[in-house]
Amino acid sequence: MKAFTKITAIVAPLDRSNVDTDAIIPKQFLKSIKRSGFGPNAFDEWRYLDHGEPGMDNSKRPLNPDFSLNQPRYQGAQILLTRKNFGCGSSREHAPWALDDYGFRAVIAPSFADIFFNNCYKNGLLPIVLTEEQVDRLFKEVEANEGYRLSIDLAEQTLTTPSGETFTFDITEHRKHCLLNGLDEIGLTLQHADEIHAFEEKRRQSQPWLFNG
């Protein structure tokens, strides 16, 4: 998992509430369990004018010019700004995979669906909760200023605007530690590999019958 420390990046606005996981990555693209390759189909039904299916050459599909993420000013964005209850609907880890593969490192919203929120942390994507008033202000600034960038410092738990205004956000110490060090659940477990091996060897000596056969 990629570590997250700090970034300064273009912000892309998605001015919709209740964006569900099927909108983030439609169900027909869920056949793979690899974490990569989903970016070209993120927001597929809004992003393209035709219906997408696995195996299609996305470079030849007609883009929807009215979809915000298709606008030239938001190309290369690494921060997604959106509205409340982002990531609702069915549980699919493919949703944060798709956002990560698209290039996003963080998502800012007033609220997130619980399962999606937890899945973001497991996949190196930082979900930031701000108040609706703060999100409204950011939407106005993003839309009024082309090339608008925000700076996110995870260690300090701050988000800074181009004018120098700073917002703080909450995150548990455990989740912050994992993101700062690029540790998913497997990586976190492997940090304790020596202790695990020592425990298993001690148990092998004290309870050898468990290991016979």
From Swiss-Prot:
EC number: 4.2.1.33
Keyword Amino-acid biosynthesis: yes
Keyword Amino-acid biosynthesis: yes
SUPFAM superfamilies, A to Z: LeuD/IlvD-like
Pathway: Amino-acid biosynthesis; L-leucine biosynthesis; L-leucine from 3-methyl-2-oxobutanoate: step 2/4
Catalytic activity: (2R,3S)-3-isopropylmalate = (2S)-2-isopropylmalate
Listed GO biological process terms: L-leucine biosynthetic process
Gene Ontology terms: cellular component: 3-isopropylmalate dehydratase complex
InterPro entries in the cross-refs: 3-IsopropMal_deHydase_ssu (IPR004431), Aconitase/3IPM_dehydase_swvl (IPR015928), AconitaseA/IPMdHydase_ssu_swvl (IPR000573), IPMI_Swivel (IPR033940), LeuD (IPR050075)
Domain of life: Bacteria
Disulphide bridges, residue numbers: none
Molecular function GO labels: 3-isopropylmalate dehydratase activity
Class of the enzyme per the UniProt entry, highest EC level: lyase
Record key words, sorted: Amino-acid biosynthesis, Branched-chain amino acid biosynthesis, Leucine biosynthesis, Lyase
Matches recorded under PANTHER family: 3-ISOPROPYLMALATE DEHYDRATASE SMALL SUBUNIT (PTHR43345:SF5), 3-ISOPROPYLMALATE DEHYDRATASE SMALL SUBUNIT 2-RELATED-RELATED (PTHR43345)
Quaternary structure note: Heterodimer of LeuC and LeuD.
Function, as annotated: Catalyzes the isomerization between 2-isopropylmalate and 3-isopropylmalate, via the formation of 2-isopropylmaleate.
Family (UniProt): Belongs to the LeuD family. LeuD type 1 subfamily.
Protein name: 3-isopropylmalate dehydratase small subunit
Organism of this sequence: Neisseria meningitidis serogroup A / serotype 4A (strain DSM 15465 / Z2491)
Gene giving rise to this polypeptide: leuD
